[in-house]
Every structure is written in C-alpha cells, then in structure tokens.
Amino acid sequence: MKKYTKYLPLLLIIPFLAACGSSSPKKSKRTKTRVDYNTKDTNGLDILTGQFSHNIDDIWGSNELLVASKKDYVKYTDKFYTRSHISFEDGQITIETLGDQNHLRNSIIHTLLMGSDPKGIDLFASGDAPISSNPFLAGQVNDQFGRDINNIAIANDFATYLIQNKLQTRRLQNGRTVTYVAIKMVAGHIEVRARQYLPLVRKMAKRYGIEPSLILGIMEVESAFNPYAVSYANAIGLMQVVPRTAGRDIFARKGFDGQPDRAYLYNPSQNIDSGTLYLAILRDEYLEGITNPTAKRYAMISAYNSGAGAVLKVFDYDKYDAIDRINELSPDAVYRILTTAHPSSQARNYLKKVSKAREKYLHIR
C-alpha cells in the first residue's frame, strides 16, 4: 500500500460540515445570510476540533490524519477505527481498519454501494455511508469475475474474496496494526463518472452557451468528477466553486443576496450550473472585448483558476490595453504566453491540463 502523503491541515475539511443541510438562496436585501455562513463555519470548527481531529489523532496517530480533498473521498466509520479512501484520480480504493474483519467487510460493502449525493453521507459522523440502489461506483469497479458491483449480494461476495485473498497489514507509528484491502478501479473510470453528469452538462451548456467539452474538461481537472470534492481554497464540488469569490458573482447574476453555501454547491445540478454560469460571466463581463473565440477560451480557462485580473495583467496592467494586446496576438501566442509568463505555476499548468482534457470530450454535443 502506498504511504499516505497528501494530508491536509485540519481547517481544510470544515466545508463538509454544512453540506448535509439544505439551503435556498433568497432574492432579498437581507444581510443575515452572510452571518449564517460565518456562524456555520465557527460551529463546524468547534465540532471538528473537539471530535474529528481528536479521535483521529488518538486512534491513528497525528501523522495519519487523512481527509477528503479535491480528488479524494475519505470516510471514517466504527467510531473512527475504520476508514475508506477513494482516489478518484489514481483509480484506487483503500479500505482499512484497526478493528476486526467484520468491520472491514462492512466498510467494503457500504463503500462500493454508496450513492452519489453528498447530502446523504455525513463524513464527520462515524456511521456507514448509506447503501444506494444506484451506486455511484457502478461501472467503475469490477469483482473477481469481472462483474459490475451493483447490489448487496455481489458486494458481499467480493468482500469475502478480498478478505480471504487480498488482505494486507501495515504498522502505524503508534504501534497499532492496520488491516486493509486495496481495490483497483477499472480503466476509464474517469470517463464512466463523466457520463453520469452528461445530462446536466448538456443542460447547462445550452443554458449559458458554453461548449460541453469545456465544462467537462474543467470538471475532470478540478475534481476528477468527485461530487464530494473540497480543496484547501474552500472550493466546493464537481466544478470547485469558491463561495466567497465566484459564488458571489454567480449569486449576483442570479439576483440572489450573499453567496452560495456548501449545501447548495454540493448539489451536482447547482454546482454544474454555478460553474458554467461563472464561465459565462468570465466570457461576457471580465473578458468582454476579446474577439477571437479560441483566445477567449484560453483566457477563460486560465481565469477560472487564477482570476480574470491575474490573466489580464500577464499582458498589461491596464485592463483595456491588455484586451487590445490579446486581440493583436494569435490564439497560439496567447496560449504560449499564458502557459509560460503567468506568474502562477498552477495557472500555467491548469491551462495545459484543461485544454488536454477538453479534447477528449469534443465529440459531445
């Protein structure tokens, strides 16, 4: 089993705490909404500090704080003695326990059969993820016979096979022994997840006039189509929308006060709507005036990651002069400059990654 190295600071997992509730944006002048969001974060930190981190440190050790991220799902169960980890980027599922094999078996079954709605799974409670009749991982994991794992009978048989044939152990620094199984996802698991969201992507693409391939390319790079995604920047969901920045622009365009909360952005439909609308805002407002569609697309992709202001400053500190400069350049030159001269290495690589990912989805209309 590969050693966990991508551990996030405690504060980074706060955004999941509000995701189990529901929130309806209000078209009003009230400011109470913003106060509520801050209160939720404060309460979330208290819960996290008092329960989650304390339990993990005591049970697994301080160097074993594994938490959810953009492309990783992590769920603790059995009073935090068992955990499941899905790497949506690497296509690897690891389920491990400090308890007995019954706990391991139970976690295997519930992980393989969990649903796709983040509101249905409380990542901070130690209970099992609910079993769904429409498992999110269906088509992404096969059992020892190559069968799709889509019901309890097959999941139970596969769990038995794994425990009898694939069981491994490792020792923690605190001296405890972990028993675990590792499951490889099928080749093309990313594309399988992408297909689950095609109806929503097509709907939002038509609504805002954004090409589906661009939406899908951004979703792949941002979250690898992980509906539970959260990042260090407090970006939420499939398209990694940041509530306090892009979220405010999105709500303003919709005529809502404040910003979307976590529950709003963990809803796949609302998340894809929000991310696609933000692309339209970049196109129609922040980057208005760029005339070449390809050059504008490059600028939109880069701005989705680093902000429109940072993109324009690569060309000139004056917005209008920057747009004039972009219009003087060929699309290839714009791409070259954004991938070499942007001060953020993350932004430079982001444009490359999204452009490459987008190519896989050009056939989708």
UniProtKB/Swiss-Prot annotation:
<dbReference type="GO" id="GO:0016998">
    <property type="term" value="P:cell wall macromolecule catabolic process"/>
</dbReference>
<dbReference type="Pfam" id="PF11873">
    <property type="entry name" value="Mltc_N"/>
</dbReference>
<feature type="lipid moiety-binding region" description="N-palmitoyl cysteine">
    <location>
        <position position="20"/>
    </location>
</feature>
<dbReference type="InterPro" id="IPR008258">
    <property type="entry name" value="Transglycosylase_SLT_dom_1"/>
</dbReference>
<dbReference type="GO" id="GO:0016798">
    <property type="term" value="F:hydrolase activity, acting on glycosyl bonds"/>
</dbReference>
<keyword id="KW-0564">Palmitate</keyword>
<dbReference type="GO" id="GO:0000270">
    <property type="term" value="P:peptidoglycan metabolic process"/>
</dbReference>
<keyword id="KW-0456">Lyase</keyword>
<dbReference type="GO" id="GO:0008933">
    <property type="term" value="F:peptidoglycan lytic transglycosylase activity"/>
</dbReference>
<dbReference type="GO" id="GO:0071555">
    <property type="term" value="P:cell wall organization"/>
</dbReference>
<keyword id="KW-0961">Cell wall biogenesis/degradation</keyword>
<comment type="similarity">
    <text>Belongs to the transglycosylase Slt family.</text>
</comment>
<keyword id="KW-0732">Signal</keyword>
<keyword id="KW-0998">Cell outer membrane</keyword>
<dbReference type="InterPro" id="IPR000189">
    <property type="entry name" value="Transglyc_AS"/>
</dbReference>
<comment type="function">
    <text>Murein-degrading enzyme. May play a role in recycling of muropeptides during cell elongation and/or cell division.</text>
</comment>
<feature type="lipid moiety-binding region" description="S-diacylglycerol cysteine">
    <location>
        <position position="20"/>
    </location>
</feature>
<keyword id="KW-0449">Lipoprotein</keyword>
<dbReference type="InterPro" id="IPR023346">
    <property type="entry name" value="Lysozyme-like_dom_sf"/>
</dbReference>
<feature type="signal peptide">
    <location>
        <begin position="1"/>
        <end position="19"/>
    </location>
</feature>
<protein>
    <recommendedName>
        <fullName>Membrane-bound lytic murein transglycosylase C</fullName>
        <ecNumber>4.2.2.n1</ecNumber>
    </recommendedName>
</protein>
<dbReference type="InterPro" id="IPR024570">
    <property type="entry name" value="Murein_transglycosylaseC_N"/>
</dbReference>
<dbReference type="InterPro" id="IPR023664">
    <property type="entry name" value="Murein_transglycosylaseC"/>
</dbReference>
<dbReference type="GO" id="GO:0009279">
    <property type="term" value="C:cell outer membrane"/>
</dbReference>
<dbReference type="Pfam" id="PF01464">
    <property type="entry name" value="SLT"/>
</dbReference>
<keyword id="KW-0472">Membrane</keyword>
